[in-house]
């Protein structure tokens, strides 16, 4: 068998495996929904507390008709994306500064570890007091969950750069900025992309925490409001939508990562 036919066979096998994996995921999800619906209808579980897929569909339809749901989704999505963009820019700039000034990195590293380990849910009430109950506070809450971990992750990626490549640029007369632009940043793109995939979920978590405490709109607000007035279908529906948003945003960044890796290998 020549190399070309072996490669085609391998690619067919790879595509088949991906299809099987996707089918298995869909089957598991569909089975879970069917079991949940059956358990609610047969009174194995209390449908008032645990709801059911059919109840969630009816609640979704009702909230769509009064146009309240899309507004809440849009607010949470906008806050999450703004938090993510700010975290991306600030963490990348901070990681660059740490790489350019190693002494500063040595001094600041323990402080970043401490700040990253703080319980963010405990910070949210303070943010409300300091900044007020507004969208800015929710965005800062979203940033607080992801920022310091992102800085440390990106800086660790910069430090993994091949030292021989850095020395080569320096031997050719390049300074630190040349090493950064020509070696460190290009070689760290996989770290950047993987960090971004984590950050988008963390920002969503932080935004929801902020909405729990100081918001009048958003999916986090719907969860708190629904639990207070015992509209548990609204609570569970909001959680399901949050899961869908997280999966969609993660999937989009995953597609960007795959596209970059495919182009870099090609």
Which residue stretches match the model-derived regions?
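C-terminal transmembrane helix and the adjacent membrane-cytosol boundary/short C-terminal tail
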Residues: 102, 159, 236-266
């Amino acid at each position: 068998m020549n190399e070309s036919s072996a490669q085609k066979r391998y690619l067919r096998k790879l595509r088949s495996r991906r299809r099987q994996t996707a089918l298995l995921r869909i089957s598991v999800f569909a089975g879970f929904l069917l079991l949940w619906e059956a358990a609610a209808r047969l009174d194995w579980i209390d449908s008032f507390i645990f709801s059911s897929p059919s109840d969630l569909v009816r609640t979704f339809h009702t909230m769509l008709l009064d146009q309240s749901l899309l507004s809440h989704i849009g607010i949470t999505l906008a806050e999450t994306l703004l938090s993510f963009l700010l975290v991306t820019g600030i963490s990348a700039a901070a990681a660059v500064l740490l790489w350019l000034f190693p002494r500063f990195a040595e001094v600041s590293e323990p402080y970043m570890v401490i700040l990253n380990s703080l319980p963010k849910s405990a910070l949210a009430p303070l943010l409300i007091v300091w900044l007020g109950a507004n969208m800015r506070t929710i965005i800062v809450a979203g940033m607080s969950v992801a920022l310091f971990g992102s800085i440390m992750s990106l800086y660790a990626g910069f430090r993994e750069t091949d030292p021989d490549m850095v020395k080569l640029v320096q031997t050719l007369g390049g300074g630190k900025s040349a090493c950064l632009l020509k070696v460190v940043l290009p070689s760290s793109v996989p770290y950047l992309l993987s960090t971004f995939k984590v950050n988008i979920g963390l920002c969503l978590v932080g935004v929801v925490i902020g909405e729990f405490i100081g918001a009048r709109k958003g999916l986090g607000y719907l969860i708190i409001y629904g639990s207070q007035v015992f509209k548990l279908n609204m609570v569970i529906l909001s959680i399901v939508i949050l899961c869908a948003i997280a999966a969609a945003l993660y999937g989009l960044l995953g597609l960007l990562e795959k596209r970059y890796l495919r182009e870099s290998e090609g």
